[in-house]
Amino acid sequence: MNNYTAYVTIKDRIATVILNNPSEGNIIDEGMASTLNSIFIKLNEDENIAVVVISATGPVFSIGRTQISSELSIHERRQILHDLNISDNLTRLRVPTIASINGDAMEHGLEIALCADIRICSTSTRFRCNDLYNGSAFPIDGGTQRLPRVIGTSWTMDMLLTGRIVDAQEALSIGLVNKVVKNDILENTTSELASLIASGATIANQYAKEAVYSGMEINLTDGLRLETDLNVILQSTYDRSEGIKSFLEKRPPIFKGE
């Protein structure tokens, strides 16, 4: 068994990042956050990676983060919050990301899942954002910003203000996850999706991701210009010409990410 609180495996251009502290509910502490950030930075520099999957060992995805003492100074607290930040490096990944949520994703665990482009969960998974409800904390890693972008303002306020548990089926109905599958097929379902994405044109996938997320932060006119610019750039790539050539030759394309 791997002794690290988080680690990565790479196979067939798919990197699987695994939270690995099941005895503690895969709780996010400074050590795990540091390891995850290092992994994400290195993966973003690896041009051979086409897809990143985030998963966890044990019966839960992550039940949250380590408690921060109320006796700390503002400076000390700010430093710990900075050290616990994972979302910045996760969302900077150029390639598509999939959260394979194998169990409860609470508080910081939910915030990590929100950073993924696609979320698949098991039928036993529950979600909760109870930082405000328990009165001891406040979202620290993008929860108040990414949750409404995924499920809308009303559902976000519902989850934040009540701290209630959202089960897998409700999560699917409000758009929090893309798919719900039985626990015993979650890994295979995720693997099949990751393989499908990895078989596509890596550069085109990256440009699509850039267009969608950057477009959400600018007006429609500028977003359309960005889409056009990326389209023009894409036409000059090897993968674009290979896609056309393979179609004409009636064979599977062999993309190089170039």
Locate predicted features.
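C-terminal alpha-helix plus adjacent terminal tail
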Residues: M1-A15, D46, A56, F61, ...
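Conserved CoA-thioester-binding segment of acyl-CoA-metabolizing enzymes
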Residues: M1-T57
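Crotonase-fold acyl-CoA enzyme core
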Residues: A6, N89-I203, T237, K245, ...
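Terminal peptide-recognition signature
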Residues: V17, N21, T35-L36, I54, ...
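Hydrophobic alpha-helical membrane-association signature
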Residues: M32-L36, H82, I112, L186, ...
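Hydrophobic alpha-helical segments typical of transmembrane helices
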Residues: H82-I86, G143-R146, W155, Y207, ...
